[in-house]
Amino acid sequence: MARKKKTAKQTILSLIPKLSKYEFEEVAQFVELSHINFHLDNLQREVKETRYSEGQYTCPFCHDTHIVKNGTQKGVQRYLCRQCRKSFSDQTATPSYHSKKSPKLWLHYLRCMLSGYTIRKCAEECQINIATSFFWRHKILDALATAIGIGDLEGLVEADETFFRYNRKGNFTKVRSYKKGVRTSTGRTNKQAKKKKRGLSRDQVAVGTALDRLGNLKIGLICTGRLQYPALKRFYEGHISVNSTLCTDSAHGYATLSDELHLNHIKIESGKRKKDIYHIQHINSLHSRLKDFMSDFKGVATKHLQNYLYWFKFIEIFKSERESIKIERAYVLSQANYPDCSVASIRTRTAAFV
């Protein structure tokens, strides 16, 4: 009697016990990512529910709620705003608006992006142009920044700042000749351009970071050069609950800030790790992870740095989740918001200080 032929499912299940630990993890990740594509319709519904979470449609242009249906176009439902008289769909003002690529490709791009791939490698994996890969990344980051928000803190808050060198990448045109003594488009000779100032100067940008014991994180650009009190106050005012405890190093400005915002201030002296139960080790550890994260990109233009800080914040929020969950959350959050982002705005943007 002939043996019954194994089904594809039975063949796969019989091979799983023979896999090494690394191979099993690869297969498990592949299955998880395939599961996302199989349930793309559910993700699209979740995007719609998140976008209209208040129970009513909102105009992406004027944000009015007097909306009526306005027929369909290529099977896609259109809506009309009675206030501004503009027509829109569920995709209007999302990163994928006007894109001719499929949602599956956008999900694949998100997987590459969250895996830390460079813009060039993302383009190769998704078979898109490098320029397209660049603009997709920044459209997604703009949307994630809108969804994640600035952040509010309470209770015991650790605060500190870290510095990145000001990067003017993309702010000037290239010159053909770059020989000795030839001036660059920044007005300096190439020999002068190589020189870097030591210590804190206008060539460095201060990034403020604050973390409470509940895991809430506030991060953003404060100012260029040495930390200035008006910029420090602007960064924290309205984002730390009254009577919270602010734990910092011996940097100037935090004592005055605590008095004005009605906070309890604990100062950790230089050279000491902690004071009683108070310390800033969590925020120092965060700085280490941030530097590692940024080092993978080999120099980010300062005008785009705020978006990369929000990307880091997204990773911190979902660091305990599975890879597939991170991709799903990134897709829903980026597609459910109304970021004011276009190719023109990305090209002409300047550094945004919180």
Could you tell me what each predicted segment is?
Residues M1-V354:
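Residue-level recognition of single "structural anchor" positions
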